[in-house]
Regions:
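Catalytic cores of glycan-processing enzymes that make or break glycosidic bonds
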Residues: 1-120
Length: 120
């Protein structure tokens, strides 16, 4: 996963992390500004061998620290973030779906599962 509700978003992390850590992440994950650091990081997660890959919506949307859900041991501003109308577009959904196909993470339909069972 790129994170949980208890840590900053990808974009928030890139703005606040130590420069050496950011440099290392960019090199290790081969990130570039054109694609977006969030998309490169998410692709690394989706491309791993784990059974599950979890990416918060704030990372898909490329939101900074203002999208953080929770700061542990604090009161007042936690659990306030909500997606607003128009943020989740059909173009974004298609982009996510395409990546799910590329990284073999797209959920199979009932028909596809049945076809696999009969092929065995």
């Amino acid at each position: 996963y790129t994170g949980t509700h208890d840590n900053d978003t990808i974009m928030g992390w890139f703005k606040t992390a130590p420069k050496e850590s950011v440099k290392y992440a960019k090199e290790y994950l081969r990130l570039n500004k054109e694609e977006g650091y969030n998309w490169g990081t998410m692709k690394a997660v989706w491309g791993c061998v784990g059974d599950m890959a979890i990416v918060p919506m704030q990372d898909i949307l490329g939101i900074g620290s203002e999208g953080r859900m929770n700061t542990p041991s604090t009161l007042g501003m936690n659990w306030k973030w909500r997606a607003v109308d128009g943020q989740i577009t059909s173009a974004l959904a298609k982009k996510v779906c395409k990546n799910m196909e590329i990284y073999c993470r797209k959920r199979k339909t009932k028909e596809e599962l049945e076809a696999l069972e009969t092929a065995e």
